[in-house]
Amino acid sequence: MNHGGNTQAVAPMDPNSIENRYGVDGSQTQKYSYQYSTGSESAPWTGHSVENQAVENGNYSNSNYYHPQPTGPATGNVQEIPNTVSFTISSTSGTANVAQDYSGYTPYQTSSDPHNYSNTGYSNYYSGYQQQPSQSYPQPVGAYQNTGAPQPLSSFQNPGSYAGTPSYSGTYYNPADYQTAGGYQSTNYNNQTAGSYPSTNYSNQTPASNQGNYTDYTSNPYQNYTPDAANTHSSTIATTPPVHYQQNYQQWTEYYSQTEVPCAPGTEKLSTPTTSAYSQSFPVPGVTSEMPASNSQPAPSYVQPWRPETDSSHPPSQQPGAAVSTSNDTYWMHQAPSLQAHHPVPPQNNYQSPLETKPLYETPFQGHQRATYPQEMNSQSSFHQAPLGYRQPTQTAPLVDSQRVSKVQIPTNPRIASNLPSGFTKMDKDSTAASAAQAPAYVSVSMPKPKDHTTAMSDPGTFPKSLRGFVERAFARCKDDKEKESCEVALRKIVKKAKEDNTLYTRDWDTEPLSTVTTTNVTNSESSSAQLSSLQNKSPTRRPKSRWEPLVEGKPFVKPASTFSSAVKFGVWNHQNENNKKSSESFQKVDAATGFKPTYSGQNSAKKSFQRPVKRQRFSGGAATAIDDEASSDSDKDLTPYYSSAMALAGSAEEKKRRDSRSKRFEKIQGHSRGNDLTKPKNANVGNLHSRRATALRLSKVFDESGSRAVEDIDWDALTVKGTCQEIEKRYLRLTSAPDPATVRPEDVLEKALIMVQDSQKNYLFKCDQLKSIRQDLTVQRIHNHLTAKVYETHARLALEAGDLPEYNQCLSQLKTLYAEGVEGCSLEFAAYSLLYITLHSNNNRELLSSMSRLSEEDKKDEAVRHALSVRAAVTSGNYVMFFRLYKTAPNMNSCLMDLYVEKMRYKAVNFMSRSCRPTIPVSYIVQVLGFTGAASEGTDEKETDGMEDCLEWLKTHGANIITDSNGDMLLDTKATSTSLFMPEPEDAVAHGDRNLDVNDFFTRT
């Protein structure tokens, strides 16, 4: 190995050793120490070394080169002299091109180097930027783009020696893409290939029979070289002369300054190679001879504008350089290393550091480097340099960062990992002895530590969400409070066992079967639960009497204590979906024994619970019976003190008298009804009440079993009431509970009651009350026949006669339903009423057209229907003359509906006449046109006079101007009336809007 004019002999190696054939692995631990001297005295060096060699038909050639790179000037036209001088070292089996520095030997001329560059000329070149004439070739920019995979030797078209960006395998990036503006690396290659196979990174000779395949090698060790005392070299000159290329560094400065990548990935804080002007010689293990140092080269006098800063804390790295040896191939193939390089002054990686890169800490040695050493060097094999007078401290073990970087040995993207050496993990520390083949070629990323369960387990008040869901599902299956109690006990056992086994936070509660929760009946030790169970076992069919009935003497009722302790303690479970969301929020309270208390809602969840609580008990026959088995509500809890005081007063004599007086309100005032009450058995009313409550219970049970059942699925026949009451006259009372058959009249009694209403001479309010009572009895008994239609028709006629349109609408809607079911009745009569009502009052054209479309041709021939259609035509066209003619000849109850519209039609008629006629209109004409006289009384003078008076009164009431002519006839002044006519307020109008509710009639009802 030649460096700075020093000659180094390489020791022979075992050709069969794989370790000697393959490249460097920087992950091995090194131990070394340095002793430097100014003379030729050797310094001991203990550790591994590397032979980074190219293989030439089984021979190992030590192809080393070194070239300093100056910074290109601003003009970008500086021509660079050859950086290297190619020469070969003689061996028994082949020749190898060995790079040699300019500063270590005297000038001489050879056939391959006629320029004879001396040390002085080379130094002056740097100081004065002198340009030597040479043949200029353009620099191929990125001619060989490396895609990350190893390129075969046959893929490069190399006719001879060329200077270009080195392309080598084993990296993910093209080295040419990451060169900084401070310098550019270029090398001269001397490839002699017998078979015309280009070798990109080797200076070798390959016979044609080898076909460029350098995998089959023969063992041929190097020959020992005798160092020359005069610093000359015993070497043969290569037959192919080197060709020097012109380098344009400014071109690369402009090109690479456009990129955003400041430096090659993974080389942000790596050390920078430096060479000393004062080189010294020291022995290297595996080398048979020593080379004396040459101190004849002067230091450059120029100031380097750019200089990569070194970092002593970073490890030495193997630099592929411009040529790639077997070490580079084996580095890509991740094979075992043979020797390892040691650099007292760490060499710069092939990818240069950016300008802004700063070391972690500086040493005087680094400052000395920045002041003295050249910019950089490229070394194919391992060599050692140290400044004069510097003593390297003994280092027993490399840093962890060094081990990691040497192990990975790949450039990384600075955007992904800007600080590669500092981002190692514990795995990298433990695997320092592992080979490069075992470590993946990726950047190590610190993985987040998995969350520990100790955080959740440290807080005794929290439980896993899956456990809460398991508890909710378990309680959702409970149908009554007994199952809830047993489920509670079972859940406590399960949670306690899980805590003892330390599986509370590790068990998968989402998949835990609910069969583990036993729902066996648990006997409650509290006396209140025993009392409740005895009450619940009683028959629920017996219902208490109404609170308005006289109270039967018996023991005062004492409300039992709260029996649903579990419901109160754990909250009443609501299996509805909207309540399940709220219930899971408050599952944080912990029981003292097991640390488990499923409180489902912080608010009063019982208010919306599906199961109601036990209502306050009532007495019937001196025994307290449970009304239902439902849980108690908050409203009853709040009213518990009031209930107790009320029950205490219920047994007093004063309360009995009050209830007796209230019950008399429902008794008949007539003597026969009083006598009937005396003949009734003592508990007759009680039995009727029980029957009514039983019906209500059956109905509620149907809805409880399936609240979403359709109406058609309910067995209404089982709930039909058959009346037994024989009273003809009965007042109407709104139903608040299931009907009592004893108070419902059968069908024959209802027919008698209808005849009684039709023949009665009482007012409309009495008849309406009786008819509504009849309708109620028909409804609860589900009677839909001709009697039902007759009752509704009678009530509708009375409502029309009284002008009670709301009641008429109710009757008419029921009649339409009955007629649609095929029940016989006066369908055409009420069809005419419907047409008149829609035309005169609702003014709903769509409904009017729908009603007219349902009429057949035969229906339209009916007198009432034909009259209704004529009235519609008169109202639509505004023909008031035709309207009042039809009003006089209206059949059935059509005139009653028209009476409600007569006032409005007369106002429109007078308004039309006053605007269209001038100057006056006789009042006698208005009387005839507006229908103030009846048709039967037209020939009598008395009726005509009455009509005249009524007409004059109406005109004056509406603001008409009446004058008298010379003959004494009454005339309407149309001009004055057109501006003074108005619609007055009705005289019988009341504040509540229903004129039928007269004050006198209201008092008669009480």
UniProtKB/Swiss-Prot annotation:
Region (Disordered) residue spans: 1-75, 106-162, 183-239, 266-326, 516-550, 595-638, 650-690
Localization (cell): Nucleus
GO process terms (BP): alternative mRNA splicing, via spliceosome; RNA splicing
Predominant localisation class: nucleus
Biased composition (Basic and acidic residues): 653-680
Gene3D superfamilies referenced in this protein's UniProt entry, alphabetically: 1.25.40.990
PANTHER family: 80 KDA MCM3-ASSOCIATED PROTEIN, LEUKOCYTE RECEPTOR CLUSTER MEMBER 8
Self-association and partners: Interacts with EER5, SAC3B and CML20.
Protein function: Component of the TREX-2 complex (transcription and export complex 2), a muliprotein complex that functions in docking export-competent ribonucleoprotein particles (mRNPs) to the nuclear entrance of the nuclear pore complex (nuclear basket). TREX-2 participates in mRNA export and accurate chromatin positioning in the nucleus by tethering genes to the nuclear periphery.
The protein, known as: SAC3 family protein A
Organism: Arabidopsis thaliana
